[in-house]
UniProtKB/Swiss-Prot annotation:
Organism classification: Bacteria, Pseudomonadati, Pseudomonadota, Alphaproteobacteria, Hyphomicrobiales
Family recorded in the similarity comment: Belongs to the NrdI family.
Sections of the chain in a coiled coil: none
InterPro entries named among the record's database cross-references: Flavoprotein-like_sf, RNR_Ib_NrdI_bac, RNR_NrdI
Domain of life: Bacteria
Gene3D superfamilies noted in UniProt: 3.40.50.360
MF GO annotations: FMN binding
UniProt-listed Pfam families: Flavodoxin_NdrI
Protein name (Swiss-Prot/TrEMBL): Protein NrdI
Classification via NCBIfam families: nrdI
Length: 135
């Protein structure tokens, strides 16, 4: 399995989910002064913000990270976290990033995810990267 790049707020839900995957990962910094530069293809894992609105659904640090053309060129897919209380906007950050970056929306999960979500993502990522290397 290849690299996971993720953003997690201070609540740490996305961080805990990625830790449970047990894969190589890099975290997008919370602060604007910190910058992450990737050098290899990755799948992005991001929470959804906005409380049910599409406005502000993608966290600002993720936007800053993807506004770097070198980072954006290496994204291969997106996984989103969210809160089902957001209704139709549940995990909508994944839809937005998928459309803007032209990459597949691979999976979505609620809050910090279940053991089933972790297994689904781990297995799905292995299959995804195998297909990527065969293409």
């Amino acid at each position: 399995m290849s690299l996971i790049v993720y953003f997690s707020s201070r609540s740490g839900n996305t961080h805990r989910f990625v830790e449970r995957l047990g894969v190589r990962s890099s975290r997008i910094p919370l602060e604007a002064s910190g910058a992450l530069q990737v050098r290899e293809p990755f799948v992005l894992v991001t929470p959804t913000y906005g409380g049910g609105s599409t406005k502000g659904a993608v966290p600002n640090p993720v936007i800053r990270f993807l506004n770097d053309a070198d980072n954006r060129a290496l994204i291969r897919g997106v996984i989103a976290a969210g809160n089902s209380n957001f209704g139709e906007a549940f995990c909508i950050a994944g839809n937005i990033i998928s459309a803007k970056c032209g990459v597949p929306y691979l999976y979505r999960f609620e809050l910090l995810g279940t053991a089933e979500d972790v297994g689904n993502v781990r297995n799905g990522m292995e299959q995804f990267w195998t297909r990527q290397t065969q293409a």
